[in-house]
Amino acid sequence: MVWPLPKKLIAAFFRKVKKVIVVEELDPFLETEIKAMGYKVQCGKNFIPAIGELSPSIVKQSLTKPVEGKRYQAPKVRIKSEDLPRRPPNLCAGCAHRPLFYALKRLGLYVFGDIGCYALAVAPPLSAMHASTCMGAGIGGAYGAGKVIGKDGLGKICAVLGDSTFFHSGVTPLVDAVYNKGYSTTIILDNGITAMTGQQEHPGTGYTVHSEPTTMIDYEQLAKAVGVKHVRKVDPYKVNETMEVIREEVNRDAASVIITENSPCILLRRAKPLEKFKSPWYAIDAEKCRGCKVCLGINCPAMSWLEGADLTKDGHKRKGIVLINKDQCVGCEVCVQICKFEAIMPGTK
């Protein structure tokens, strides 16, 4: 979505063409705004569906008659979509959200999530998010569930939301949780950027939307300012330490906040996220791997499974082994920490 509308750019475009087609999903937002500027849109929602997701074939089917003046003829389908390999959306290799949600799953917490990359934690094998309604609803949901259902209803409860979501609509429900004596734990995932929707700045990055240095709002000070007495920080890449801090905070009879640190978005180049990792990539020791698949539980895209009954060097049976793609691995060491058999080691050239 482009807003504010680039009116000069649109005007320059209209001067170069004879007809304009506006293709957008759902409501005719851009189309309406362009018409309000006084321009004529030949094809828009009068031909293109206003519901559902658009695809090249749907757009072509919708515009063939008004643009080309002939009926649309569907091409022969060579490959059916259901026959294509499935590739569900996933967190990036090395993403700090992955070990955090792995820790939450290990602790068996009921997690109220929010809107961001971390919403992918709802899917297996992580399956570590149980509710996600709308932006900013995580903290209110966790606090409200604790008040209405009680501690015996859902068990230990926590809310998880990203840094930009916290500034957008997370402060108010945190105030409510403190004011109304809630006891839920809020985890703020500070990855230094608005990651999912385009790498925009926010009040916690230290830069304006024009990339100018500005005041960086401190999460810890803000949480304490609204009355949260228990605020702690964790490095999510240190799985056991993170689990211990979360375990302590969810057992408090008061609202608490945990902030992740040293965990910038893996795509945020200015933060140099890869410099903290000791090795550029890791590999599986085929002699030690038992094929237990525990490491696959973090759902890292750099890891895959090689099927095939086999024996380890010391005679243990296994159904296969895990493989690590060195071109995708960034060396975050999360898999190293959870492997019981020390079968993951720094890669060599």
Give the location of each predicted region.
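Short gly/pro/ser/thr-enriched loop/turn and capping motifs at secondary-structure boundaries
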Residues: P4, P28-L30, I48-I51, Y118-L120, ...
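Iron-sulfur cluster-binding cysteine motifs and their immediate structural context
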Residues: L268-R269, R290-N325, V334-K349
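Active-site diphosphate/adenylate-binding microenvironment
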Residues: P75-I139, V148-K151
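Glycine/aspartate-rich loop-and-adjacent alpha/beta segment that forms the canonical ThDP
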Residues: E248-S304
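Gly-rich Lys/Arg/Thr-decorated short loops/hinges at beta-loop-alpha junctions or inter-strand turns
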Residues: R78-P88, A119-A128, A195-T205, K224-K229, ...
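General beta-strand structural signal in soluble alpha/beta enzymes
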Residues: V22-E24, V41-G44, R71-A74, A93, ...
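Terminal amphipathic helices with adjacent charged low-complexity linkers/tails
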Residues: M1-A74, T260, M345-K349
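Thiamine diphosphate
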Residues: V122-I259, L267-A271
